Amino acid sequence: MMNRFIAYNMPKIELHCHLDGSMSVELTKKLLADMGEEYTKEELQEALTAPMDCPSLADYLKRFDLPLRCLQTKEGLRAAAEELALRAAKEQVKYLEVRFAPSFSTQQGLKITEIIESVNEGLKSAETKRDIHTGILVCAMRNLDRETNLSMLKDARELLGAGVVGCDLAGDEKAYPTSEFHELFEWARKNEMPFTIHSGECGSALNIRTAIEYGARRIGHGIAMKDDPELMKLCADKKIGVELCPTSNLQTKAIASIAEYPFTKFYEAGIPMSINTDNRTVSDTTCTDEYMRLTEAGMFKEAMCQKIYMASLATSFADDSVKQEVFSRWPLM
C-alpha cells in the first residue's frame, strides 16, 4: 500500500480546484479584517469548512459566501491565487489549473479582464517562488443569464494564452441541465477555447453525454456514468479526461460511501483520470489526502502513480512547452 510520505512527495497534477473554495482560514480572516469585519479563527473554520456528513449540497455551497466577499478587489484576488498555488506547490503539485467565476467578482466594479489578470498575477508570483506551472479556467455559471456568461467568455478569450487556458460550466446541474448551454459552448468551440464541464456530479449521466457531444475535452466529477458502460467506453475511446474529487463527492452525497467510488471502474475502462481536491478549504483536503483516501479504500496503488500523472498531463489544457516542462518533473522518465 502506498504510504503518505510517497503520496506527499511524488509529483502531482491538479486540474479541478476552485479558487473561492480553497482560500485558507488565515487569508480569509485577514482580508475580512481589512474590510473591517472581525472573525475568530474558530468562527471562520466552522463557516468555511463543510463536515463530512454535510446534510445537503446547499449547505456545502454556503461555505463559499465569505470567501467570495474577499474576491472583489485586485488585492484579494491576487492574494488568494498566490496562496493557493503556493499551497499546492508545497505538496509537489507541478501543474495546477485554478477555476473560478469572474462574474462573481464584479460587485465593486472590477472589469472581467481586470479580475482575470489579478488572479493571473497572483499565480505567476507563485511560479517565481516555487516549482509549479499554473493555468486559469474561467467558469460560466448555470444560474447566470446567457448574456452574462457569453460576455465573460468573450473577455476571457482575449486572455487565452495569457493566463487563461480554458473554460468551464459550474452550478446546479439539476435546475439548469447542460442542454440549455449549447450556444455557449458552440461559441467556445468555434473560438478554439478548450472546455471542461461539471457533469454527472448530481446523478445525471445525460449531462455527461451532452457535454461530450458539445466538445468538452474533460468532465468534472463524472460520477453518474459509473453504471453506464457505454458512456464509460465513449470517454475512454475519445480520451475524455475525468476530474475525480473523492472527498467532495462524499460530502455532497454524489456517492453514499467511498466503497461506491467508481475509480476502479473508470481505471479498468481506460478512462484518463486526474485526482483533485475540488475545494481545499471547504472540503478540508489536499491532493495528498485525496490519493490516500483512494489508497486506504484499496483502490489506488503506487504502481498507478505514473499513469495517473501522465493521463492528467495529457488531458490538461497547458500548452506544449508547459507540458514538456511538467513531463520532465516525473522522476522515472
Predicted segments with their positions:
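Metal-cofactor-binding active-site regions of metalloenzymes
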Residues: 1-193, 203-207, 213, 217-218, ...
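Conserved hydrophobic beta-strand within the GNAT/NAT acetyltransferase core sheet
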Residues: 195-197
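Acidic/histidine-rich helix-loop elements
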Residues: 200
